[in-house]
Amino acid sequence: MKKKLVSVLFAVMVLIVSIPKYSFAAESGKVIFINMNRTTIKSMQDIPSLKAELEKRGYMGLMNIRGDKGTDDKRSLASMGAGGRANLASDSYINFKEATKENATIYKSSTGKTPKKINDLSINQSLNENEANGQYGSTLGSLGQTLSDNNFKVAVLGNSDTVENGELKENRNICLIAMDNYGRVADGNIEDINIEDDTMPFGIRADYDKLTKETKSLYENNDALFVDLGDTYRLDQYKGFLNEHTYSKMKKTIHNNISKYLESVFNMVGDNDVVYIASSFPSKLAYKNKERLSPIIKFKGNEKGLLSSSTTRRDGIVANIDVGVDILNEFGLENKSMVGRAYSLIQKDDNVDFLSYELEKMATISNKINSCKYFCRSCICILGYRYGSYII
């Protein structure tokens, strides 16, 4: 009898131990993060399918976009993936490529690591820069590394490539949020996703038919997918070459293309999946006007409201360093080196109006502080204490 009992207990223990962590993915659902860079809250309302979805559900927040030793698009994305303010090498040393026989050899010889499908061939430059000159001790690629270590599959899709002096200027910074500690992403497409279109900024745009098809394929074969809708970034960079009429025309076309794409995403995802839509950095005009918090939306379940986190302790105000932590939390994971905090979801029906008002109010206060900071120390102390860490 004892032998039978021991045998049964042993068999149960073997079954429990043998269940891989990945087997819980179906329960936790999948994650899609969509970067709609250089987009404002107001512009998001101009995208029909997104506006319709927000009328029904979605939690919104305004996101601090600061990095380490500077504030820009790439540092914001890297800070999301690091879970702390991150520093990077200059643009010329960020070099994500899909693996070939030649560049895979170069990558391995410089890092000593086995390349994956997508690799930053110059990752040591950013790792060394962040370690030597970073002020916050953040670890690049913490999000991607933690997912990989726990057998969750990660993919990236899209780019924000532009044209400079007649030559293609690569921008595959979406990889900075998804990569592991060595600048690698296991799956995706960052190169063959755009088509020529002379009616669009820089004469190129995303191929939305291919983007939709590959989103579905990568979604089915991975647990976390990070998508860069580069057309919004390209439009903001190209704005100086346009007048009011041509800018509005291009913007409307881009928004309609994005609307169809997002509609396909909303129809594709399951009930347990989570979709994030964010602008990793404000538009140039918004930044100039002191609107230095970017919108982020989390679609989870059927309720609507505000995002909050203990990083900022203000309803509706979050930080880029919270993004990676919240994504890990959706998979039941954590990384103690990441200092951001997972979101709290606060019910509020008028979330869009509330955040639009908050953003306008903070921009006004920021302008007031900057206009009198050399003359009114009490203004800085009072207003800066309440809002300064978010907007100045």
Residue map of PLM features:
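C-terminal segment of classical bacterial N-terminal signal peptides
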Residues: L15-S23
